[in-house]
Amino acid sequence: MQNHKKIKNKSNQKSTALFFQNLNRNGKDRIILKDLINHLNENGLSKNDPRLNSFFSKINQMNGINEITFEEFDKLLIESKDLFEKMFRDQLVIPEFKKFTHQIQKIYAQVKLNKNGNVADYIPQLKKVSSENFALSICTLDGQRFSLG
């Protein structure tokens, strides 16, 4: 059993190193925190995701540091490693979330032009709502979120 843990730990360390290298665009063995956060956002994961509370709490404790080393990166991910691993391996429910949201924006713009129909007047709360109000929200099982309107 102990051997299995060592193998799994080595495997996790390798994948974390791979993720780090993918974000290491400046070649200085440091990554820019903003790039990591942008990667989260592009995949539909936000600051409001409770699984990322520890991650963002640690970032806030860094007092404005812009770049981090591999060791700091590894410590940041430790409590959300499974989520980050799914994200970096494009294994979230919607792997190319950015492309997906672009398509949704196009559909939303087309549907919003449709002025047919009426607001449901048999629901008292809806009677008072403007027929111009229109919104769309998506939340996947992995917690990827996107909203318009």
Regions found by a protein language model. Give the residues of each.
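Generic secondary-structure transition motif, activating predominantly at the C-termini of alpha-helices
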Residues: 24, 56, 60-63, 77, ...
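Short acidic, hydrophobic short linear motifs in intrinsically disordered regions
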Residues: 32-34
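Globin-like tetrapyrrole-binding proteins
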Residues: 37
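Primarily EF-hand calcium-binding motifs
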Residues: 2-30, 43-72
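A short, well-structured edge-of-sheet supersecondary motif
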Residues: 112-148
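Low-complexity, highly charged intrinsically disordered N-terminal segments
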Residues: 70, 74-115
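Short N-terminal signal/transit or membrane-insertion segments
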Residues: 65-82, 125-128, 140
